[in-house]
Amino acid sequence: MTLTPFAVPEYTAADFSQETWWLSLIKAVFIIVFLIANVLLALWVERRGLGRMQTRPGPNVAGPLGLFQAFADAGKLLFKEDMWTRRAERFLYFLAPAIAAFAAFSVYAVIPMGPNVSIFGHSTPLQLADMPVASLYILAIASLGLYGIVLGGWSTRSTLPLYGAVRSSAQVISYELAMGLSLVSVFLMSGTMSTSQIVAAQGQFWWAFTLFPAFVIYCISATGEVNRLPFDLPEAEGEIVAGHMTEYSSMKFGWYYLSEYVNMLNVSAVATTMFFGGWHAPWPLSHVEFLNSGWWGMLWFFLKIWFFMFLLIWTRATLLRFRYDQFMNLGWKRLMPIALGWLVLVALVRGVTQFVQLSTPILFGSVGVLFLVALVIIWVTDKPEPEPIPASEREYTGFEDGFPVPPLPGQTPVASPRARATIEGTLATATATATATATASAIDNPKEGTDE
């Protein structure tokens, strides 16, 4: 018996045949304006939303409902005094915020925001550029933004910013690997790494449901990628003030702050493109043909990215910060093995479906359910690691990992050798005195004999 593979469907890529230089310029300017406008909206929505979730009003002074609060904050940053540390590496100190902002704004260059539309008589897709490896471009640019954080923390020659930079590099390495593995399953199912073709592949069903475990892994990893609660260890206020941004002021701090919110929009756009059908209308509106054409796609794309933005804001309002060891264990001991296991399953099923005609959504849905059930069983039966004994309950020796440390509340300080010798000498003297006193008392007061 000879097994003949079925033809892999090829999805239509974005058509840039009528693209001109001025159309590309208009799109580039539009993307910058779109991102800045959405950052201003995100600041207002987040602060008002957090206020409602925490039973407080939120910003309500600058303009109606506090709508102009973000503009007031931006103006304040523009006119603040520009300061830096005396020992800072000036060139890298000024360059680092620019690198972070450039990397953040560059991701949207390959994000399809809508189908082909007519602009001044030219048919062009609502996408600045596309390439066969556009998804790899997104991952590469996201990694480039890490240099802005690391260089910013190191160039200040200050302790807390350096701690934040090191934490951020460890965090990105830990979670970007899991995020990349979750996207590989999308590449296998779509048969391409072009973002426009990945969106075209989701015309009938979204990968968020077919590849649900990969979608969950991406959402968790993306939250860690943008340093948001519960993964905001590089900027933990109670531990290292503001992390790598501690020694920055004025608009250099503003660039970092802007890039953080643009990165939130970036991970939301990537989630929309890879898992939520891109600019396609949601079911059941997707069956109406004109709702999947023209400028309607822009509306669906906008609503979908704001769905993910709301999830990021919601998690910040409800979840607590992870402890650092819990955070690293989740990335390396949980997400990485799960992502690898799911990728192997996707590759096997994808290979089978090339030789056997099966319904892909039903097949992957059933495999995904079985995979999740297996994970739940493993999670329930897995014995938790013993919690470390708090330092306040451990025997205090005066040293921790070879370094002298002061005692914590509840611990008894260890006496120095001189104090110990003094205490031992005093105790010996007191013991000898007590013994002599008891002996003298026994001699002076002998026991009376018994009557016979």
Predicted regions and their residues:
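Selective transmembrane helix interface/packing segments
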Residues: T2-A434, A438-E452
